Amino acid sequence: VLSPADKTNVKDAWGKVGGHAGEYGAEALERMFLSFPTTKTYFPHFDLSHGSAQVKGHGKKVADALTLAVGHVDDMPQALSALSDLHAHKLRVDPVNFKLLSHCLLVTLAAHLPAEFTPAVHASLDKFLASVSTVLTSKYR
């Protein structure tokens, strides 16, 4: 459960991401594909090379979903319901992959926002991404 301090930390940190959200989303995906090659199996139709338009496009989708979650932090299940349905029923993404992407997002944010990435912000973002992952996997059951 996100505390009021966690929610503030997440909103402040995501606000600093600003116009780079899509770029950071794509970078996190690239990190995931390189670090966890089995995740590539969900994207057989993508050009997964560095800087590809498809990875950038999906990175923007990831970032947009996170922006939506930040904006609806008190009602993520409702806000992310369609995305949860998509990943559970159509795409059938293994839930462990959300944890892998979350880790890569944290690494990416730490690399780009070192001054802002304090231990408290790190913990809050980790809890937030775990909450997003829980919502996205809630319809698997």
UniProtKB/Swiss-Prot annotation:
The modification Phosphoserine is found at S3, S35, S49, S102, S124, S131, S138. The modification Phosphothreonine is found at T8, T108, T134, T137. The modification Phosphotyrosine is found at Y24. InterPro entries: Globin, Globin-like_sf, Globin/Proto, Hemoglobin_a-typ, Hemoglobin_oxygen_transport, Hemoglobin_pi. Gene3D superfamilies: Globins (1.10.490.10). Heme b binds at H87. This is Hemoglobin subunit alpha-1/2. It comes from Macaca sinica. CDD domains: Hb-alpha-like (cd08927). Transmembrane segments: none annotated. The keyword tRNA processing does not apply. O2 binds at H58. Red blood cells. Belongs to the globin family. Heterotetramer of two alpha chains and two beta chains. The modification N6-acetyllysine is found at K16. The modification N6-succinyllysine is found at K7, K11, K16, K40. GO terms for cellular component: blood microparticle; haptoglobin-hemoglobin complex; hemoglobin complex. Keywords: Acetylation, Heme, Iron, Metal-binding, Oxygen transport, Phosphoprotein, Transport.
